[in-house]
């Protein structure tokens, strides 16, 4: 779900566009990974974007607020982030969260939150929380925190 600009798709942002910013950094004590979706001011967002953003945010909050016992796997938690989208017949094609390393890779396992995440989560494991929704050719939304 990472956009790659090409000569054919390269253009200036316009009022009413949604701009998805995926950023992070590596520091002595760890790695960061954050994504935000912002509206370029001047026009209303694309049709359906407010509802989709709200559903993504609800899923993000549900996962962030979850309290669960040691041994719960990522597949069990994945449903919390997807449920608001599923209620509207929507979904996203990527995992909800990935392990995060320090000095190695921002995407590091074995822990992950996804439809296939079978590794039991344990204290000390860092996993991202990044549900999204992508309306092909229209807009994309993702909210990510660690």
Protein language model features and the residues they cover:
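Active-site neighborhoods and metal-handling regions in enzymes and metal-associated proteins
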Residues: 1-146
């Amino acid at each position: 779900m990472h956009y790659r600009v090409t000569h054919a798709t390269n253009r200036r942002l316009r009022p009413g566009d949604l701009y998805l910013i995926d950023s992070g950094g590596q520091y002595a004590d760890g790695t960061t990974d954050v994504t935000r979706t912002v509206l370029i001011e001047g026009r209303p967002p694309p049709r359906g974007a407010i509802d989709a953003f709200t559903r993504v945010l609800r899923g993000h909050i549900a996962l962030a607020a979850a309290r669960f016992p040691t041994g719960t796997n990522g597949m069990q938690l994945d449903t919390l982030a997807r449920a608001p989208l599923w209620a509207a017949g929507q979904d996203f094609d990527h995992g909800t969260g990935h392990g995060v390393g320090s000095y190695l890779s921002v995407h590091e396992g074995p822990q992950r939150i996804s439809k296939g995440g079978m590794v039991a989560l344990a204290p000390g494991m860092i996993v991202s929380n990044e549900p999204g929704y992508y309306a092909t050719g229209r807009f994309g939304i993702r909210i990510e925190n660690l």
